[in-house]
């Protein structure tokens, strides 16, 4: 079903189901002996969502590289990228807090468990913003397995298309304190104008010394829906009907690094190939990736 203004979802439908997909990838990466990431909560969260395909992947009952033996290396590269994407944002948060930041905001937090698994310094407050059904699901699921946050976790149950800055302030957010902002895997699900507004709001709430991390996804500009559907054909054959082209907003939008720079941020970009090289992971080109050469970006705010 195509996106519509004001649409909503839970963790098993629409955009919400993509959180289970990402969490399944983190579960696979956690089992990987290379130890790129450690997310002990990924698999329990995926099981609780209840999408059979993702549960089998998360539990190791199905190997994603077996979807298409002719492109096993390409699929392994996709799995590795999920691990490295997670590692990029993990390292970003650790660097931000090592620099003295004690206020963190995760935008569209989904099934992100960083508030429970990262070694946050004493006094760190982690705000998670997402739709109410998603927030409630994760909170209750992790409480049910006895998980406890490693920072002060404050949830902000609101759609990012609503007045989330006001809701964030109401939860105790201090705009006078530097903040580490994260928009991981979010921008492709926002219309172009909503992407700009998101970062306008982030900037308005940021004190000097705040940091931000997100991705630049060039393939969304000239998104090939048929290529995307072809890439997931084998998953559909196994009962997973997740039509990604209907969930993303494609077409012209501003380059996120350039836009943030114009707002007073000093930005740096790490292309996917360099991210792989940084961690010594072999990169297998997959030319049929509809999202193109993703760049992982981070920056620091200088103006106030």
Swiss-Prot record:
InterPro entries: Ppm1/Ppm2/Tcmp, SAM-dependent_MTases_sf, SAM_mthyl_Trfase_ML2640-like
Entry binding sites for S-adenosyl-L-methionine: 130, 159-160
Any one GO MF annotation of this record: methyltransferase activity
Ligase listed as a keyword: no
Major enzyme class: transferase
Keywords (A to Z) from UniProt: Methyltransferase, S-adenosyl-L-methionine, Transferase
Pfam families given in the database record: LCM (PF04072)
Function text: Exhibits S-adenosyl-L-methionine-dependent methyltransferase activity.
Annotated protein name in UniProt: Putative S-adenosyl-L-methionine-dependent methyltransferase Mjls_1071
């Amino acid at each position: 079903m195509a996106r519509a203004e004001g649409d909503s979802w839970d963790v098993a439908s629409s955009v919400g189901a993509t959180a289970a997909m990402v969490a399944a990838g983190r579960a696979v990466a956690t089992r990987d002996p290379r130890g790129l990431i450690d997310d002990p909560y990924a698999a329990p969260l995926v099981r609780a969502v209840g999408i059979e395909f993702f549960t089998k992947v998360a539990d190791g009952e199905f190997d994603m590289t077996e979807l298409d033996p002719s492109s096993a290396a390409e699929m392994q590269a996709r799995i590795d990228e999920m691990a490295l994407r997670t590692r990029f944002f993990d390292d970003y948060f650790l660097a931000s807090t090592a620099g003295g930041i004690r206020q963190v905001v995760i935008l569209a937090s989904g099934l992100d468990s960083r508030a429970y698994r990262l070694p946050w310094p004493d006094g760190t407050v982690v705000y998670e913003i997402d739709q109410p059904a998603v927030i409630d699901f994760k909170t209750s699921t992790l409480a049910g397995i006895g998980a406890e946050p490693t920072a002060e976790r404050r949830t902000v149950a609101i759609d990012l298309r609503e007045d989330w800055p006001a809701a964030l302030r109401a939860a105790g957010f201090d705009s006078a304190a530097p903040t580490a902002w994260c928009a991981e895997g979010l921008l492709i699900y926002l219309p172009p104008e909503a992407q700009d507004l998101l970062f306008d709001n982030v900037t308005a709430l940021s004190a000097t010394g705040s940091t931000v991390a997100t991705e630049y996804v060039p393939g969304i500009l000239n998104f090939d829906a048929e290529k995307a559907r072809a890439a997931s054909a084998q998953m559909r054959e196994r009962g997973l009907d997740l039509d990604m082209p209907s969930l993303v907003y494609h077409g012209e939008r501003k380059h996120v690094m350039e836009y943030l720079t114009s707002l007073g941020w000093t930005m740096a970009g790490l292309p996917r190939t360099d991210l792989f090289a940084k961690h010594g992971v072999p990169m297998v080109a997959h030319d049929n990736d509809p999202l193109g050469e993703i760049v992982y970006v981070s920056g620091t705010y200088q103006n106030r």
